[in-house]
Structure formats: C-alpha cells, structure tokens
Amino acid sequence: MMIEKENKNIAFVDGQNLYMNTAKKDIDPWKIELGRFRIYLEKKYNVDRAYYHLGYTDKKYQDLYEKIQKAGFIIVFKQHSEAMVGLKKGNVDSDIIFSAMKRLYKKEDFGKIILVSGDGDYKMLVDFLIEENKFEKILFPDRKFASSLYQKLGSEYFDYLENNHIKEKIELKKKRAP
C-alpha cells in the first residue's frame, strides 16, 4: 500500500508591506523575529518554501538579507534597471502574482498558497486561487492597513499577524536590561 505524500504549501511574503505595517508603523510598532515567523508558517500552515520578496538589492542591507536567509526564507529581489536601483519603492506585487500564476500554469506540485500582505493588489489573485482550491490564507500584518477589498472574504481565508495568539509566537522579544 502506497502512502500519499501530503502536498506542502508555499508562502509569498511582500517584504516591504510586512515591514511597513509592523516595525515602521507610527502607532504601536513591533518587530517580527524572522526565524520564529518561518517556524510559525511551517507548523501552522505546512509551508515548505517561503519566498520573501524585496524591492531591490543594496549592499548596506546585506545583514538584513543574511538574517532573512538564515531564518529559512528564499529571497526574491525585484528586477530594476541599473539606472533606477535605489530610486523605486519595492512594489513586488506583480512579481508575486506572476510567480504564483506561473506555478499554477506549470502545474507545479504544491498544496496551497499563503500570502503575507495587506495590499489590495492581490485581490484578483486571491479570488482565483480560492476558485482553484489553491488558496490557504492571507496574513495581514496590520488590521488597520488591510485593504478594504478583502472585506467580503470569508474569515477562514485571513488572519492578522497582530492578533495576540499569533504575535506572541512571532514577535521579537525585547532583551531585558541586566
């Protein structure tokens, strides 16, 4: 008797959206400990591969890139022409959408997709993935900045990273003074 292997899920993280809506927000900022976040994605959502999309490379952020990779994420940088590097914001939405659709088109062997962003630009992708039974969950970094386009999405398809039951598992713990 052959045991069927459970398909592993894939996560796509919009790195700028995650950072801007947690650590960089004006009210009650908090930092995610990337290693704990990666483990959370694996344990809670059976994520085998987690792609962390960033806007562009800059040597001054090399330490950050190493932290992201050490935590178990696969970094994907947005392609820019040499003249535009450093002048554009991240805007990785189309890259994430294309990557997800390419995997579907090529019939890549995976379970479902988990998306980490509050950006409304992913709404059509989310709707299509639900229709194709290939969508697990969208994790909004911040309730206040989650796009209103997702309001009609059933609660089984989303959660907020700032919710206490998630935040306590992934938040960077502040070191206590000696």
Regions found by a protein language model. Give the residues of each.
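A generic secondary-structure signal
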Residues: 40, 99-103, 128
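Short, surface-exposed amphipathic charged segments that create phosphate/polyanion-binding patches used
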Residues: 66-68, 88-97, 151-153, 170-178
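Internal catalytic-core helix/loop-beta-alpha segment
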Residues: 86-116
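Acidic, PIN/NYN-like endoribonuclease modules and their adjacent C-terminal/linker elements
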Residues: 127-178
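Domain-level signal for Mg2+-assisted phosphodiester chemistry and nucleotide/NA-binding surfaces
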Residues: 1-88, 92, 131, 135, ...
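Well-ordered alpha-helical segments embedded in enzymatic catalytic cores
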Residues: 33-37, 95-100, 121
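Acidic, metal-binding active-site segment of PIN/NYN-like and related structure-specific nucleases
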Residues: 106-135, 139-141
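Short, well-ordered alpha-helical microsegments
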Residues: 61-62, 122-124, 146-147
